[in-house]
Amino acid sequence: MKNRRCSKGGMLMKKKISSDNILTGVFYLLLALVALISIFPIVFAFIGSFTPENYVTQNGFTLFPKELSLETYHYVFQSQGYKLLHAYGNSIVVTLVGTAVSVFVTVTYAYVISVKNFKAASKFAFFAYFTMLFNGGMLAWYLVCTKYLGLKDNLFALILPYSMNVFNMYLMRNFFKGLPYELTESALVDGAGHITILTKIILPLAKAGIVTITLFYALQYWNDFYLPLMLINDDKYYTIQYILYKMMSNIQYLAANPSSAVASHIVLPAQTIKMAITCIAIGPIIIVYPFIQKYFVKGVTVGALKG
């Protein structure tokens, strides 16, 4: 009797393990499919940027073109080489400085509203949340930025409007609230101030959250072309995204008007230029992202659940 029970238990265990393996296999298959769908546009753009314009005109974009060429990149860097390098420099400066400023403002604001005994914390939290619900409109924002804050044709115009993202601020607040309050309480008893507590105790424990919002802000500054479009007229302050946007618009205009003097003598890469511009714009992100991916995943998960 006992042997029969053991036999039945073993069979049930084997069936459970078998079903778990099947579910795991299906799960991995779905993940692989999602990864393939996600990476396909990047690979497609990369291959398309090396495809000759004439080949694309005749055959369209393909994953395995019979001809490869650097003519699109040659055109881009030959016509806008210096401006591209200068715009890259502007984007790097704006991204580094802007990210540092935004992380500082976000972390300090989040810490203030996460302090347990701070009576005005709820008021500061609501003030930030209110800006997510309502705004003064584009015209009021533009007038305040240009006429009253002097954010016109300078690098500050590309940094200060994005000083704090409320979503990132609440993400950091959730991190801080998820930490044991006993750490802060014991530090206060020992005579430590809030600056010391924040820099020596809180920030080292919230490293994943800081890396997460740093990535968010870096992507925001690097990919932005709205602020240059609205606040920049001087081309020496153009960022890489905006100058690529203008370049693509100009090429599409010339390609749509073949009677112009320039377009009549040159075959413009009107189609492949989109692919090349995409690769130029996202190249630095693709290089950096794998090194901070683990912090990004951990930060989003923990920050969203705690608090």
Map each language-model feature to its residues.
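A hydrophobic, multi-pass inner-membrane permease signature
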Residues: 7-307
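Polybasic, lysine-rich low-complexity intrinsically disordered segments
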Residues: 2-3
